[in-house]
Structures are given as C-alpha cells and as structure tokens.
From Swiss-Prot:
Location(s), subcellular: Cytoplasm
Recorded catalytic activity of this chain's protein: (2R)-3-phosphoglycerate + ATP = (2R)-3-phospho-glyceroyl phosphate + ADP
Name of this protein: Phosphoglycerate kinase
Name of a matching Pfam family: PGK
CDD domains to which the protein is assigned, alphabetical: Phosphoglycerate_kinase
InterPro entries associated with the record: Phosphoglycerate_kinase, Phosphoglycerate_kinase_N, Phosphoglycerate_kinase_sf
Primary site of residence: cytoplasm
Binding site for ATP: K207, G298, E329, G355, G356, D357, T358
MF (Gene Ontology): ADP binding; ATP binding; phosphoglycerate kinase activity
Residues that, per the record, bind substrate: D23, F24, N25, R39, H62, L63, G64, R65, R121, R154
Enzyme class: transferase
Amino acid sequence: MSEIISIKDINFKSGSKVFVRCDFNTPMDEFYNITDDRRIRSAIPTIRYILDQGCSVILASHLGRPKNGYEEKFSLLPVAKRLSRLIDREIIFANDVVGNDAKTKVAALKQGEVLLLENIRFEKGETKDDVALAKELSEYANYYVNDAFGVCHRAHSSVHAITKFYDEEHRAAGFLLIKEIEFARNLIKRPIRPFVAVVGGSKVSGKLQALTNLLPRVDKLIIGGGMAFTFLKAIGENIGNSLLEEDLIEEATNILKKGRELGVKIYLPVDVVAAQTFSAESAIKYVSTQEIPTGWMGLDIGPASVRLFREVLSDAQTIWWNGPMGVFEMDKFSKGSIKMSHAIAESFATTVVGGGDTADVVERAGDADEMTFISTGGGASLELIEGKELPGVKVLLKAES
C-alpha cells in the first residue's frame, strides 16, 4: 500500500484557509449535553497544528443520521461550545453548510480563527458523494485535511468527492487519521506475539470477514457476545432461544476448522447469564453453555467464561478487542463486558480497542486511560482489519512514483 500524504508533508502558506473534515459524531443526552467528548478531543492536535502554521480553520462534521435537512437534535452547536472550552478560544458557528450564513462567515474568516459548519449531513448530497456539493465546499479553503477516520469507509462528499478539487500539495490526512491507520496496519502486519483477538457483538455476519482475515495472523481467538451462539450451535451445544444465525452455522464450522489447521486456539464461552426475556425485570440464571434451558437465552458471558478468558489473555503481548461480551446496555447483562474490559486494561499487552460499542464499554468500565489505543471508528476500524481499502484513505495516498 502506498504511503498516505500527511499533514506534515504539506507546506501551509500563512494566511490560508484549511478545510478539516472531523468526526464529531458524539453521544448526547436528551438535553443535548455531550456525554462523551473523546472524538472532539481527538481532533485537537490537528486543529492546533494548522493554527500554528498561521492559517484559519473551517471544520466540518456529521452527527447522527438526519433524514430531512435540519433537526435540532442533530445540530453541531453543542459541539462548538464544547470545542471552544477544550481549546480555550472562540469557535465561530455557521447555521448552515453551503448557505448564506456559512458563505458569509467563511469569507470574513481571519487568520487564526476557527469556524464550525453546521451538520454536513443536513445537505442531502453529502451521503451521495455529490460532486456539486464537494465543489462548493472546496471553494471555502486552499487546503483540505481529513481527520475523520470514523467515516473513511464511506464515499461521502466531504470525505471522497472533495479531494478531486485539491492536488497532492493541498490535501492530506490529519494526525488522528494517520494514527488510526498505523495502529491497524501494525496490528495486521507486525503484531508483537502472542497476539490475541477478542471478538464480540451480536452477529457473526458483521464480523465474518474480519474473523477470516484475522485467523492466519492471531495466536488465540476469543469469541463472545451474541455471535458466540452460532459457534456453540456449530459444535452441537443446545443454545435454547439464544441469538442464532442459522445460515452461518456452516461458516462458523469452517472458521473453527481453519483455526485447528492453523494452530490457532479458539475459545468460546463456557457459561452464560440466561433469561427468558430481555428486560430489566426478568429473572436470570447462571448456566453452563451445555445447559441453557429451552425457552431461555444467553445475554452475557458468565463468571467461569470471564475466568477462562482472563487466563487466555494472561500471556498476550498484543490484544485487539472489537465487540461487547453481552447486551451491555442493560446493567444486569453488562458484567461480562465490564470484567473483560478490566482484564484487557490490566494486561501488559499493547491493547487496541475497536470503536463503537466496545469503546463505550471501556469508557463505562473506567478503563479508557489504561488502553494503549481506542479507535474512533467502529465500521472503519473493522474494514481495515478485514483488509479492505477505505475510500476516504485511498484518495489521500501518494501517487506511485
């Protein structure tokens, strides 16, 4: 793979405007208070670096998936306020993306100032990789920097089409994007061994390609979460009413077989927290995976599985974790995921956490500071591990000389 153009490769001309695509897709409560500002904090090194070059910065991001233009719950105004506090300077906020307010504020932007555009997905063309929208955005700035790893797997207008309007000397990847790619590449190509992958989440279908790509590279593989039940079914266990992807039993069998051929040890849960219904009021039982009663379903890994997995991790030098061990959103089914987070955080390994739900588990467990690296992108992180080329990264590669 060619080398990516870094922000450090660009000779920024003082007084220029720089368009920075960020990922400020942050969770908020019902009062629009940001509950986790990790993604905002992650963008700060790139913003500061550009300001230090004597430029002004135009920030663009999405938040959620708005369907019909402006919706208050998807506004980036709370992000502007939080970012202002974090970098201790005024953030000018535009009430639109390519409307009069944005254009007026971009034109008036002075050296050293920072402007945040409203949610870029309020423009319908964004998710369609619309070239006309990309051209309008490109007219705002002399340089383009992508620091939004979390959307690099999507060919969207502000990530993909916009790069057509900047040559190699005027487009680059920001510090966060480069860091994300380096961690993923090293994980796949140069892991320090023993390398253990911990894969959870609800569905095998979402992780199938990642599992296939990881198998020849890992020493041990732990499979938990809802997806484990398809594997347990494949080895003949009675899984009751637990989540099952029947059409993938054969694929699960093939993965287990391939693991044996490659000498990779694959570990599945040995016990679960079972309930008859998924609700806070439902009675629970701790049962072995061989004894899940008919009509009951496994919703978290049990204490014996936690002990087993902790033992498996004890000699690891590299750990990659993607996907919770149970339905962690509900307290009574979150213990397995929380304990797994503690076990990974306490290890002496290089620990890389895939974004999305897994990052939320780590935050909730209070282990964020103990992990080596927490990815800001769930889907993008997974696609890199799957060996796929990300559209937003491909357009930032140096031309083959």
